[in-house]
């Protein structure tokens, strides 16, 4: 049987929905994912307009989109997913169809994508409908599309994120700045943003160095860190105050004991491969059933502490996206 092997690039994933006619392409907006490539696009936090993509990289994405649409003779909608890695743009996949991001990008750009594409298919060009080719001007507001999961209703389901889509819905956070927009999105998912200031950390070895500055941020913001042995030793070696908790098999001071005290706000669990056969899976399932927010991506954990640092004293604003 044939096997396809792709090289994995730990880059920034970017997504485009575009409308194509015989003369050109209209790109309502470019969407940037918070989680790096490897997490299914439907499970990633999506940001419009992009926050960390250079203007010259955006232009390359526009150019690739136009060239691909022309080469594939697409009339109507096209969805393209890219990876930006070390200032190089790579194409993950091209889908000559609509995608789940169409309602999102239509709402936040005020371009009725489905309506325009339908008229294109029926013979009316993009320009005849009053739009210009190329990338549409970006809006001043920032819009965050955040996935919602139903793991508590699916007994035994693995919650760590990967290439298989697991989310069952999404919410939208909108503001004039990124940090408030993502703060609203976190609240919209029903997550109790940390209040008790206790966080459990269990991080695989290959991610410990990357986790270090994130751990420092949580500690400096006033959180007490609890960690299993490997993560505990690593944080202690780098002079970050942390309390040790034992694995499930131990009889006292276990991770379960702490979770049962109802004092844990958040769990950051970066699993190893095949961790569903180990303690990690049991911990993640217990957290879901106990209603404790748990993140299995450092990018999400980083986004949360960033917005908490900048939003903890401010009032959230109201934004009318129809204006």
Label each region the model flagged.
Residues 1-195:
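ATP-dependent carboxylate activation and anion-phosphoryl transfer catalytic cores
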Residues 97, 205-206, 271-275:
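Short glycine-rich anion-binding loops that position phosphate/pyrophosphate groups of nucleotides
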Residues 188-199, 218, 257-264:
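Glycine-rich phosphate/diphosphate-binding loops that line cofactor/substrate pockets in enzymes
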Residues 214-220, 288:
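Surface-exposed amphipathic alpha-helices with a cationic face
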Residues 222-234:
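Short internal beta-strands
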Residues 246-247, 255-323:
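Peripheral docking tails and interdomain loops at the edges
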């Amino acid at each position: 049987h044939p096997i396809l092997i792709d090289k994995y690039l730990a880059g920034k994933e970017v997504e485009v929905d575009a409308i194509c006619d015989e003369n050109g392409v209209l790109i309502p907006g470019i969407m940037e994912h918070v989680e790096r490539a490897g997490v299914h696009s439907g499970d990633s936090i999506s940001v419009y307009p992009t926050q960390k993509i250079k203007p010259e990289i955006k232009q390359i994405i526009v150019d690739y989109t136009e060239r691909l649409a022309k080469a594939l003779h697409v009339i109507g909608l096209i969805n393209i997913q890219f990876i930006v890695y070390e200032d190089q743009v790579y194409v993950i996949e091209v889908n000559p169809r609509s995608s789940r991001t169409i309602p999102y990008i239509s709402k936040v750009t005020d371009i009725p994508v489905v309506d325009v594409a339908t008229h294109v298919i029926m013979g009316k060009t993009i320009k005849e409908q009053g739009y210009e080719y190329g990338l549409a001007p970006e809006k001043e507001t920032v819009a965050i599309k955040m996935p919602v999961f139903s793991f508590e209703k699916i007994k035994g389901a693995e919650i760590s994120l990967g290439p298989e889509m697991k989310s069952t819905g999404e919410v939208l956070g909108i503001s004039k700045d990124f940090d408030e927009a993502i703060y609203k999105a976190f609240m919209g998912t029903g997550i109790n943003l940390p209040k008790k200031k206790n966080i459990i950390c269990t991080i695989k070895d290959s991610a410990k160095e990357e986790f270090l500055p994130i751990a420092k941020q949580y500690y400096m913001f006033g959180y007490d860190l609890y960690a299993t042995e490997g993560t505990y030793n690593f944080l202690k070696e780098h002079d970050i105050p942390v309390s040790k908790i034992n694995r499930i098999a131990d009889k006292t001071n276990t991770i379960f004991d702490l979770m049962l005290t109802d004092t844990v706000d958040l769990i950051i669990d970066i699993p190893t491969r095949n961790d569903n056969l180990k303690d990690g899976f049991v911990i993640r399932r217990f957290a879901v059933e106990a209603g404790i927010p748990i993140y299995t991506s450092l990018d999400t954990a980083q986004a949360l502490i960033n917005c908490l640092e900048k939003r903890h004293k401010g009032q959230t604003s109201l934004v009318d996206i129809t204006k």
